[in-house]
């Protein structure tokens, strides 16, 4: 029965892909583990695109046993993710531009070496170096002790190895690649949330999509939260770089961020002693409830854009951490169901959502690497069309206090 449930969950993500080849890289149900593995367009006898997909098992230090999967498209992007770390994306490169950042954490840390409750619930930071981290799903946000327990920073899912991992490649052009995983947050008497993740990419393109299906497998309703913590450093982030998004309002996360409210749209150079500033946004969307947020370099010819649905992800957080390059010069663009306040505050302010027993919900995001001025201009035009003539409201008082 359990195996049937797993296969059924993965099947939700397979519909419409009849003419495709697939490979199971990991399966906890069947005891499958491919370890080091590779497939190439040449092996598949594809002549009009050149690409490869490779899984490697890492060794040494705290990355011992961690797995990474890399998609390499000769005329497009190189995308690297880690099944060991909740299917998080490590970095994306292409056209001389990178989406990602330089963390002091250099290894792909195996969660077996992380205690999430260390440093008063900040143990999550010991592995934090990814471009995209799923923060959730049982809870997310800053750590807090409540209800006789520690709600650690940004939840657990980013530190749970995937139980099922598969690769699928369409046999016909444009040869769409799909990397799927199943990540389980299951604790006796507490929670049974399972997330079927999917990354889809068409070789040669400058964008990819995430499609995640969260299912409550328990017999009782359960709360959930999610923040897609998406992080960008150099060469996109620099002095004079800009954050753009159509928003109804912006407010500082805390009193410290008040000092940066007037300059929320621009970034400083690496600055020693700079503490992080966080801003909360209420995003605007088009008639289909779609919106976009982006960080653009000073010259306006490089950037990273995220498109998402505001019904699925109704709030947006922007994290400025323009500290030194060694310490971590990075900004986060974070669509979510919640802001980054502790779950206790998010619950009080009615942003924590609930899934009924057996119910599923899904999240769809598209990431685009902008590598010329025309692409940047198109995103700016799209933001302006949604924003209209009304300027964002700047609210000086934080909506909550930790």
Model-derived regions: residue spans:
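Surface-exposed acidic/polar loop and edge beta-strand patches at domain peripheries
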Residues: 21-209, 221, 232-269, 282-402
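An amphipathic, aromatic/His-enriched active-site/gating alpha helix that lines ligand/cofactor pockets
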Residues: 229
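Sec-dependent N-terminal signal peptides
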Residues: 4-13
